[in-house]
Amino acid sequence: MDAGQPRPEDRHLPVMRDRVVDLLAPAVQAALEAGRTPVAVDGTLGMGGHTEALLTRFPHLRVIGIDRDAHAQAMAAERLGPLADRVIPFHGTYDRVPEAMAAAGVTKVDAALYDLGVSSYQLDDRERGFAYSYDAPLDMRMDDTAERSAATLVAELDEQELRRIIRRDGEERFAGPIARAIVRARAEAPIETTGRLVEVIRSAVPVAAGATGGHPAKRTFQALRIAVNEELDILDAAVPAILDALHVGGRLVVMSYHSLEDRITKRHLSAWATSTAPPGFPVVLEEHEPVVRVLTRGTEKPTEEEISENRRASSAKVRAVEKIRTSRTTA
């Protein structure tokens, strides 16, 4: 890396790092006490901050590091240095955890972390087109080998589908006017940059809304990013996949940054933590008993001190569970 370039560890502050490690630590320790080499899954390796903390604390731990962003994986390897010898990288999305585990030669894991959403590195890399704060190509692909970019969606989707995505994935109340404005604007010239898209969105959102609801493009950019990367569909498949993959005693931590992510996470964790026995049954059979127990009361959030040091941590919410028996065959 050039001398003028910041190191990966200087550019990325892992959110709630110590709390994440503390939540996963008992599962790693239990594996050691059982006489096996503990294995964790970092389903969203990013720049490796959480994995670095886990590997540093547990010298015998191995981590399967999953990420669809090859650039981030390379920077994680640089950051981890000699610790990288205990990381088994997997290029792909984290719903493919069974494939990643098979490639690593393991059938069960002891701990797992999903740190959701877009990373600081991706937001700060202007050429990736994730941010509305500066002009850049309208891309938003977490995996730059994927075919479909945000510019593709903006160019090809009809008004009804654009409105649906912006409303569903961005929770944007002005989804209709924004979708209409996009269709009108692209008829005049292609919308290929973030700056042009911001202008189009501004033209559709009442000025008064921007005074109280933050940047007028925030929710539309979120919606397009989620749609381009199929983030919610992947999360929906990934939570049950990793719960099934955990050893009994294994733990999962999920860190979300907006209500859509947290809603999906909560739905799955609550279902796995709830008995499936019909109400009023005098005896609850084992197959109906909860598979996990919830470790967090609702969600846990960063401290004010951490938020003051890393403003991007402000919206983080953590949920965690421990697997207490083998998975239901229908889970």
UniProtKB/Swiss-Prot annotation:
Region (Disordered): 297-331
EC numbers: 2.1.1.199
Entry's Gene Ontology cellular component terms: cytoplasm
Family matches, as InterPro entries: RsmH, SAM-dep_MeTrfase_MraW_recog, SAM-dependent_MTases_sf
GO MF annotation: an example: rRNA (cytosine-N4-)-methyltransferase activity
UniProt: S-adenosyl-L-methionine binding residues: 48-50, 67, 115, 122
Record SUPFAM superfamilies: Putative methyltransferase TM0872, insert domain, S-adenosyl-L-methionine-dependent methyltransferases
GO biological process, one term: rRNA base methylation
Basic and acidic residues bias (residue ranges): 298-312
Keywords: Cytoplasm, Methyltransferase, rRNA processing, S-adenosyl-L-methionine, Transferase
First-level EC class: transferase
Compartment(s) where it occurs, according to its Swiss-Prot or TrEMBL record: Cytoplasm
Chief localization: cytoplasm
Pfam family, one: Methyltransf_5
Catalytic activity reported: cytidine(1402) in 16S rRNA + S-adenosyl-L-methionine = N(4)-methylcytidine(1402) in 16S rRNA + S-adenosyl-L-homocysteine + H(+)
Gene3D superfamilies registered for this protein in UniProt: Putative methyltransferase TM0872, insert domain (1.10.150.170), Vaccinia Virus protein VP39 (3.40.50.150)
Family statement drawn from the similarity comment of this UniProt entry: Belongs to the methyltransferase superfamily. RsmH family.
NCBIfam families: 16S rRNA (cytosine(1402)-N(4))-methyltransferase RsmH (TIGR00006)
Described purpose of this protein according to its UniProt entry: Specifically methylates the N4 position of cytidine in position 1402 (C1402) of 16S rRNA.
Official protein name in the record: Ribosomal RNA small subunit methyltransferase H
Gene: rsmH
